[in-house]
Amino acid sequence: SLFFYSYFPIPPQQTHEAGVFLREIAKRLLVGLENKLPDLQDRINHIFTKQLFGIAITRLTSLLSRRSLYCSKTADGKYSICDCFTNNDGNVKFDNIKHTWNEDLRCQFCGVSQTQETYKRTDMEVFAYQFIHTYNPEEIFNMKFDVIIGNPPYQFNVGNTSGNSSKAKAIYHLFVQQAKKMQPRYLSMIIPSRWMTRSTEGIPDEWVDDM
């Protein structure tokens, strides 16, 4: 999952899957903004609608993240502690998008093969993660973010039957690339360190050099 955070006041201009990062940031903001926004409900509404945003990697993790953050799986639900959302998602997005296939029958964004049933099925999620399946990640929320925190999926087990995880196709570097495009002041991603050895399948040398 990916989590986005803007400071208060917002300057001119993705926890793990259960939304823990967002929840812990919210707890600190509730304390830190007490003098600026003394009314608790006003403070909650401001933090959840103006400062904290997330992208879930599956529908299930979107529901878990909203429950962790808003105390309700729907942001505008009866039990949500934020009382000004007018949609189910709030600021925790999940869109079940599809892969975009090129002439080689591979996704032009993440590189998975159309020959694998998991990624071309129409009735279930296909793991076309929204953040990396766009050329313009900044348009997902149309905002400038000060901080981006992520715990992205590490890899696709594409044709890997050896049990050697280093031979699976890495995708975590794509999340780092997209986050850097958004030019946050701070970027923190939980990713494996294997890229340093240049031995991970799918990670180009150019990306390692840039890191």
Each model region followed by its residue ranges:
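SAM-dependent methyltransferase catalytic region
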Residues: 1-211
